């Protein structure tokens, strides 16, 4: 059984990695333009050929990006009509990079917060949409991270989750071994 000290050590190791090497580093986004799309249309586009039929009205949508890194993912979330975005990350260096890039693009309506997913309840908010890609697998207990995210997801909300897998990375590993 692993103790809290082990969990803390892993958190610190991940935090240290991204403090030293904010990820992903990006200089510009080719053809970036802010456009708006309804959440229903955005989700239907992403899950094609499947479809959702929801009555998302014109209420303001609260969006959480859990593990926003250097902010590139934030640009994609800006497409949601009538939305307010909160983006969290463990790494202050990554958040500083995100802030700098968003400022360069004239984007000032995103709340950036340094926070571990394990502390997500401290925000005191619930969200209509939660995006978390490439993050949970870094946690000592990914299931606990998912449970906490689901705890701040509103009823009938949407969770966009991305995990790394050995199968999905097989070609990358093969290419690296070849090089």
Question: What do these predicted regions represent?
Answer:
Residues 70-82:
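Conserved SAM-binding loop of SAM-dependent methyltransferases across substrates and taxa
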Residues 120-130:
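A short acidic, Gly/Pro-enriched loop at the edge of an enzyme's catalytic core
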Residues 20, 25, 30-61, 76:
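Conserved alpha-helix/loop element of class I SAM-dependent methyltransferases that forms part
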Residues 91:
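Conserved SAM/SAH-binding beta-strand->alpha-helix loop
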Residues 106-118:
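Conserved SAM-binding strand-loop segment of SAM-dependent methyltransferases
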Residues 3-8:
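Short, small-residue-biased leader/transition segments that mark boundaries at the very start
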Residues 143-155:
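A short glycine-rich, Lys/Arg-flanked "PGG" loop and its adjoining helix->strand segment in the class I
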Residues 158-179:
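Conserved class I S-adenosyl-L-methionine
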